[in-house]
A protein has these predicted regions:
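ATP-dependent adenylation/nucleotidyltransferase module used to activate substrates
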Residues: 2-149, 155, 185-193
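Catalytic subdomain that performs nucleotidyl-dependent activation
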Residues: 64-65, 135, 143-223
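Generic structural signal for well-ordered, non-membrane alpha-helical segments
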Residues: 12, 117, 207-210, 225, ...
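Residue-level detector of flexible, active-site-proximal loop/helix-junction positions
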Residues: 72-74, 102-104, 166, 182, ...
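Short, solvent-exposed polar/charged micro-motifs at secondary-structure junctions
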Residues: 106-109, 210-212, 241
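A short, charged, Gly/Pro-tolerant segment at domain boundaries
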Residues: 209, 227-242
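Residues that form generic nucleotide/phosphate-binding pockets
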Residues: 18, 22, 217-220, 231, ...
Length: 242
């Protein structure tokens, strides 16, 4: 077996192991669940659908999966929808395309990123509720959770982050993040090994704002202490914040 092939298989096993661990530790999936997978076309959501589909096959189809892409009419980005549909079919799931749009919020000053995210989320909620899905799987990885924790510490004075599982108040739906224990570096390697292309072209708002700046700060912290990310992750779990 070639070295690259061995590395790819080892990486696949490592990521799958961490997904399984997260699903068990945070009780993310139960038999009979009907789960929508938010498929943007980026590496994270592509990996999410792949590993959940692998779990589903190994669990004899004890839960249902369906991939959903929300197309934003007023955000200048492009996605190869045919590629997403074919990828979902390869993973053994259905595929649904939803259209949505948001209006700029000049009075309250909410960012375009917030409005876009909330509009997508609401479209997913409405579809899930109308079609009998009780959970929505999102592709946030461990670095996303750590970054959110740093944002909350810095700007809100709170020690909190996105949780692995979150039951919505106004919808009979639970958000789950099965990649929450997976490092982004592993997802990048997985995308390279499997030649899964991130079909989404760069969002115009992707490198604007405090969150992008925080990425640089966290890189500096990692240089200062190579165990920084692991220490923060341990603290979040010890405090029951994940």
């Amino acid at each position: 077996m070639k070295s690259a092939e061995k590395s790819a298989k080892s990486l696949e096993r490592r990521i799958l192991h961490r997904v399984r661990e997260a699903v068990a530790a945070y009780q993310l999936i139960e038999p009979g669940d009907r789960i929508l997978v938010a498929l943007s076309g980026g590496k994270d959501s592509m990996a999410l659908l792949h590993f959940l589909s692998v779990m589903r096959r190994s669990n004899n189809g004890s839960f249902d999966l369906k991939a959903v892409h929300v197309r934003m009419a007023n955000v200048d980005y492009r996605t190869d929808l045919q590629q997403l549909k074919e990828y979902a079919e390869q993973c053994g799931t259905g595929f649904e395309l939803l259209d949505a749009a948001f209006e700029p919020d000049e009075k309250q000053g909410r960012s375009a990123c917030f409005l876009c995210s909330w509009t997508r989320r609401k479209a997913l909620f409405n579809y899930a509720q109308a079609n009998g899905y009780n959970k929505i799987a999102l592709g946030h990885h461990r670095d996303d959770l750590l970054q959110t924790a740093m944002m909350n510490l810095t700007f809100n004075g709170t020690f909190a982050t996105m949780t692995a599982s979150h039951a919505m108040d106004k919808f009979p739906i639970t958000l789950i993040r099965p990649l929450c224990a997976v490092d982004e570096a592993d997802l990048r390697l997985w995308a390279d090994f499997t030649e899964v292309v991130a079909t989404v072209k760069a969002c115009p708002y992707d490198k604007i704002g405090k969150r992008h700046e925080m990425q640089g700060i966290m890189q500096q912290m990692q240089t200062f202490n190579p165990e920084f990310r692991q220490s923060l992750w341990h603290a979040l779990n010890k405090a029951g914040k994940v």
